[in-house]
Each structure stands twice: as C-alpha cells, then as structure tokens.
Amino acid sequence: MSALDVYVDGVGLWSPQLADFESLRRVLDGQSPEPPARRPAAVVLPANERRRAPESVLLAAEVAGQAISMSGQDAATVACVFASSHGDQAITDYMCATLAEVPTELSPIRFHNSVHNAAVGYWTIATGCHAPSTAIAAQRASFGAGLLEAASQACSEQRPVLLVCSDFTGAGPLLEVTACTQAFGCALLLAPTRSAASVARLRLTLTNARPSSTLNPPLAGWRESNPSAAALPLLVQLVQGHGRCQVEAAPQLGLQIDMESVA
C-alpha cells in the first residue's frame, strides 16, 4: 500500500484525568490539570438523549464534538469512523447476567444500546449527519484499524473524515478478559488537504513490525488500562509537533505514523 498523507484539523480527548487535548499538553509540561466531571458532558446530544444514553455513548460524543469544534467543520456533512475494542462492556455484562438468570426481564432500551454502532447512531442522529458512517472493532488494534480506515476514506473520497476511538470501563467477568480499568476516548478530524485549521500532517505507512512506541508515566499506565489509549503516542506527537510512532492495526500489521507540524 502506498503511504497515506492526511492533515489533522481537530483533536478531541477525554479520560478521568484529561478533560480535553489541552489537558494532555499541560500534563506533558509537568502540570496537573483539573480532572473533568465524572460523566462526559457530550453537549452535542440533546438533553433527553444525554439522560438516557449510556456512558460509552457520552464518551464518544464528547470527544467527537471537541474535534469538530476545533476543526470548524459542519458535523452534518462529515463522514465518520467510530472504533471501539469492546463496545459497551457494562451493558454486555448486564445482558449476559440477565439472560442467564431472568431473560424475560431484559431491558429493550439497554438491548438497543448494546449494539457496537450505538455511538455512531446517536452521533449521526444528533448532528443530522447523512454522510457515510462506519463502526470498527479490532480488539487492542482498534485505534490503528480505525485510523487506517479513516485515512483511506479521506484520501480516496477527498473529503474530511472524523475518527472516534473510545472504550469505557469494563464490568463483571468481562473485566478479567478486557483489563479495561478506566475510560478513554479520542477523536481526530482528518482531511486530505491542508486548511487554515490544520495543525499537523500525518504520513501513514503499513509495516510488519510490532509497535514499539514508548511512553513515560503516567501515560504508559493509561495506555495499559484501555485499548483506545493506544492513540497516546500519536497524541503526544501532536503536542510536541513532530515525531514518529507505531500503532497496531491488526494482529500481524503495524501502522507507522510520521508527523510534522503545519500550524
């Protein structure tokens, strides 16, 4: 595959320690930013939807909204790729337990929210988006797989594409398998051409090498605690304005990312 060149026009970020991308910048500067509220605000969703949406949806909508706001794009016209390693683990745990014990009491609303593309569904409805949307799962390679898909769409279709990658905390027996101990979500608005909003250019190249990008504490621990936090090496580069990192895109496939600032 030829290298893919895309521009980053917007960034979104949320975790229990980081309210947004600027908070990461402050952490890397040695500061201790104020942590966000316990639940992501997700102000892009109508109030009624925010009340009934699961936290996994709020997380995805929050970081997506941040990236769109930073880019100045109209969310209604932007194609999107939503990636998640495990979807909503709390609902999956609830459904498994309920089906095993009292299947007739399974909540239709929680079942509705259990599907892997629930977050992208809430997003496209809330924003009135009729552009193409994609939902991807690739276990711990979900960020890399999502980035490859979003960049491919941006280059082939010559249009901006919103990438969202998020996972919420695991629950029940699933937590022993997923080891997802805290929430993490990020979003990138990728564009095929440079604009006034562009902050960096990414060159993506496929490689057979295993990802080897290192992180310092506390970021290394955050990456281990959530598969979507595999994005952290790239997010650190975006703060620093240059660099090269690798992320996993499939079990035997890596994605090398060379970044340079254009801001």
Give a label for each model feature.
Residues M1-H86, A90-R110, V115-H116, V120-S133, ...:
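Conserved "HGTGT" condensation-loop signature of ketosynthase/thiolase-family condensing enzymes
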